[in-house]
Amino acid sequence: MNTPKVNILHAPGQAAQLSRALISTCHTRPLLLAGSRVATSLHPTQTNLSSPSPRNFSTTSVTRLKDFFPAKETAYIRQTPPAWPHHGWTEEEMTSVVPEHRKPETVGDWLAWKLVRICRWATDIATGIRPEQQVDKHHPTTATSADKPLTEAQWLVRFIFLESIAGVPGMVAGMLRHLHSLRRLKRDNGWIETLLEESYNERMHLLTFMKMCEPGLLMKTLILGAQGVFFNAMFLSYLISPKITHRFVGYLEEEAVHTYTRCIREIEEGHLPKWSDEKFEIPEMAVRYWRMPEGKRTMKDLIHYIRADEAVHRGVNHTLSNLDQKEDPNPFVSDYKEGEGGRRPVNPALKPTGFERAEVIG
């Protein structure tokens, strides 16, 4: 039995050039992009049309990736459902999400914003984004057009790198607030659960993309280093100033919304033909987690769901940054009074700059 071929991609400095080669040729020649093995199958051959197509994209031989996290077979357990089931999104909610930026108002806001810009710069380098693929630097969080689009391979590398560290802030904040609650012998007023759920949701984004892309040694090394630095930085930052840290995460989620919005635009404009192909299948775990209906399971639909999640994190963290970090309850899980001016906050995905304290606490 022949071993299936897998396209190999790494070397971030040559990402754009090598990714172009991936699209323009029909060869299974090894390519390198940030240490990732990307499964690529766009048009199945005539002999394979009758068999189920794999969740990948290749133009020559059918490529299959090993399952990085197969379910462990046990004598009694059939499956383990998500600890936090996703509530799902309506199409109107998803299409209403737009990139937006909250202007810094304090020194802490300004510091958080500048740190995010540094992170964006480092991520662009790590994932091989070339100057001609950059958006307008005067409007980096809202501009979504560039002189040259990214390729599918570049997008997957970028998604995996971003999502591998995006799950860190919620876990760090939830852990520290949990320990703080134990030390003070006081309730946390609903913050911990929201923060941990955010971290869990980001991890599901990562696992979904890993079903389409196998990280190579270089990518794993970059992720290991980035996560180690980011975890410790978030840990110290949250101990010093939770308010600034939540603002930082809010700005970070603005970048995430911008990233996925640009990807959606490039799919719609036909720059990513493999993801526009009707035969392309998204991972089954994504269909189950987001409860995606029949007829709404394209790559574009998947990115819409993930972008809506990121928009929620954006609104939640900007709101939490506006609150009293020690005393205020979490407005997104609280029951509100009726008839006394109190009002439940609307979907945070639709409030890009977050709610001010007076709007949700009084």
Swiss-Prot record:
Binding annotation for Fe cation 1: E163, E202, H205, E310
Main location: mitochondrion
Bilayer topology term: Multi-pass membrane protein
Keyword tRNA processing: no
Cofactor info, note text: Binds 2 iron ions per subunit.
Domain of life according to the entry: Eukaryota
Annotated TM spans: 156-176, 222-242
Major enzyme class: oxidoreductase
The protein's required cofactors: Fe cation
Keywords of the record: Disulfide bond, Electron transport, Iron, Membrane, Metal-binding, Mitochondrion, Mitochondrion inner membrane, Oxidoreductase, Respiratory chain, Transit peptide, Transmembrane, Transmembrane helix, Transport
Subcellular localization: Mitochondrion inner membrane
Pfam families from the UniProt entry: AOX (PF01786)
GO cellular component: mitochondrial inner membrane; mitochondrion
Annotated family: Belongs to the alternative oxidase family.
Protein's UniProt name: Alternative oxidase, mitochondrial
Originating species: Neurospora crassa (strain ATCC 24698 / 74-OR23-1A / CBS 708.71 / DSM 1257 / FGSC 987)
